[in-house]
A protein has these predicted regions:
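Conserved non-catalytic scaffold segment of RNase H-like nuclease domains
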Residues: 2-116, 120-128, 143, 147-165
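Conserved beta-strand -> loop -> alpha-helix junction used to position metal-binding or nucleic-acid-contacting
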Residues: 125-138
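Residues immediately within or flanking Cys/His clusters that coordinate Zn2+
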Residues: 151, 197, 217, 223
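Acidic, divalent-metal-coordinating active-site segment for phosphoryl/phosphodiester hydrolysis
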Residues: 166-179
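Short, flexible, mixed-charge glycine/proline-rich loop motifs
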Residues: 185-197, 210-213
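Short cysteine-rich clusters marking metal-coordination/redox-active sites
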Residues: 200-203, 220
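Short cysteine/histidine-rich zinc-coordinating motifs and their immediately flanking basic loops
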Residues: 211-217, 231-232
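Short metal-binding segments enriched for Cys and/or His
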Residues: 224-232
């Protein structure tokens, strides 16, 4: 149960694995949180790394879905004609997520902006849930990759991408990716990313050796968001 009265600030971004969370995904009419609308929202509730519940619905955006969006997500006007509006869906989604940490791919730059906007617009609520962006984790685990799209990660791990770009399918794909990224971060994965690396006690990201005026020191990889340092 989320306490609506207590939420006066947005949750923070975490850069670590958590075993209990709701992984969610939105499909939209376009890429702008200023002008575009949600047309599908899905989520999977996870406990101890296992999916225990699902949430998924199409959403009527009250406008025509551009061809370019339909070409990507295969959602067309006739599919959402009888779907509920997002204003009706949000209280149901809020009940589903409760106080859980939210997880998703590229959500810091995209999905969270839509959620923040619409929770404030329709419910007068500042969403307080902390969140983890698997794109950020992928940058930590695979710093040399050129692209870290969800499909790239799924292909790397041998996870099926059939049905990609529909929200619930993407959620299930991303959930498997998140669990495997978690193993990478703990040193149990396909590559030991923690070799010779410490973890920042402040934000959970990796510490790396940096050079300063007075020689080498440990600095958080989350810099400039996190400025924690340690002497070597």
């Amino acid at each position: 149960q989320v306490d609506l009265q207590m939420s006066n600030k947005r949750g923070k971004q975490l850069n670590k694995y958590v075993p209990d969370y709701v992984l969610f995904d939105l499909e939209t009419t376009g890429i702008s949180a200023n002008y575009d609308e949600v047309i599908e929202i899905s989520g999977v509730k996870v406990r101890g790394g296992k999916i225990i519940d699902e949430f998924s619905t199409l959403v009527n955006p009250g406008r025509t879905i551009p061809y370019g969006a339909s070409a990507v997500n295969h959602i067309y006007d006739e599919m959402v004609a009888d779907a509920p509006e997002f204003e009706e869906v949000l209280p149901l989604f809020l009940a589903f997520i409760g106080n859980d940490i939210l997880v998703g791919h590229n959500i810091a730059a995209f999905d969270m902006k839509f959620l923040y906007r619409d929770f404030e617009k329709y419910m007068g609520l500042i969403l307080p849930n902390d969140f983890v962006d698997t794109l950020r984790l992928a940058k930590i685990v695979f710093p040399d990759w050129k692209h870290r799209r969800l499909g790239d990660l799924a292909n790397y791990y041998g996870i099926s991408t059939v049905g990609a770009h529909r929200a619930l399918t993407d959620c299930k794909m991303n959930q498997k990716v998140f669990e495997l990224l978690g193993k990478e971060l703990s040193g149990e994965g396909t590559m030991d990313v923690r070799q010779n690396v410490k973890t920042c006690p402040k934000c959970g990201m990796m510490m790396v050796k940096r050079k300063g005026k007075f020689g080498e020191f440990w600095g958080c990889k989350g810099f400039p968001d996190c400025r924690y340092t340690e002497n070597i």
